A protein has these predicted regions:
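Extended amphipathic alpha-helical interaction segments
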Residues: 84-91, 95, 100-224
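Sec-dependent N-terminal signal peptides
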Residues: 14-23
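C-terminal motif of bacterial Sec signal peptides marking the signal peptidase cleavage site
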Residues: 26-29
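Intrinsically disordered, low-complexity sequence elements enriched in Ser/Thr/Gly/Pro
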Residues: 10-11, 186
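Immediate post-signal-peptide N-terminus of mature secreted/exported proteins
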Residues: 31-117
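Short, Lys/Arg-enriched N-terminal segments with co-localized hydrophobic residues
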Residues: 1-10
Length: 224
């Protein structure tokens, strides 16, 4: 009987090793992609609050105010998401791994998520309860889901439209100072460049949040 138990334990260990090798093999080619994904995630999360751009030109100053107000309306949404997920690295890691598999293996999002989910579940099978990863991923998902993704996505869609409207106004600003002297034209052009950069950051921030909340909704099928 003891020999049988030893053999079973040996087989379990071999299966655990095989699972680890399979997981490592799957993500070996994904390492560089994961690093890129993680760096981009960290870059957007670290975007600072906006600074108000001032201009003596009323048209430029008005658009600068609109851009500032929009960004500082969006930025707290980013900080809210960060605060909800910052202590749930397993969840953000899971979502980043899904993105890696999508890019490296050319899979659709649902197929990539199913693949990573199956691998995590396989790894968890032989782990002690305290070391299982999937329950921690579920905790992270629940924290993000508590922010009401459907409502957030509707709000983000509205803000994307507003960003586009302000961007179109910014594109017309050079007409407001075309008759000025050379030095003032340079100064106004520099101000418009700053406004454009700010609007670009707003667009990046909104795209990031939209993607995160959309993934929360897709992931709900695995967190019932």
């Amino acid at each position: 009987m003891r020999e049988k138990e030893k053999e079973e334990q040996k087989m379990k260990k071999l299966m655990m090793v095989a699972g680890a090798v399979a997981l490592a093999g799957m993500f070996a080619g994904c390492a560089s992609t994961r690093e890129v994904v993680q760096k981009e995630y960290e870059r957007v999360i670290a975007l600072p609050p906006a600074e108000r751009i001032h201009s003596p030109n009323k048209a430029v100053d008005d658009v600068a105010r609109l851009s500032f107000d929009l960004y500082n309306f969006c930025h707290p949404l980013l900080k809210e998401y960060e605060a909800a997920t910052t202590n749930h690295r397993e969840y953000t890691g899971f979502m980043n791994d899904v993105q890696c598999v999508m890019k490296d293996e050319g899979l659709g999002e649902e197929d990539a998520m199913a693949k990573v989910y199956a691998l995590v579940q396989g790894e968890d099978k032989d782990r002690p309860d305290a070391e299982k990863v999937w329950p921690r991923i579920k905790e992270g998902w629940a924290a993000a889901n508590a922010l009401n993704p459907a409502k957030k996505l509707a709000e983000i869609a509205r803000l994307v439209v507003r960003n586009q409207e302000i961007s179109e106004s910014a594109a017309k600003l050079p007409d407001s100072f075309k008759d000025g002297d050379f030095q003032s034209k340079l100064q106004r052009a520099a101000e418009v460049d700053k406004i454009t950069d700010q609007l670009t950051q707003s667009a990046e921030l909104l795209a990031f949040l939209g993607e995160q909340y959309r993934k929360v909704q897709v992931n709900k099928f695995y967190n019932k």
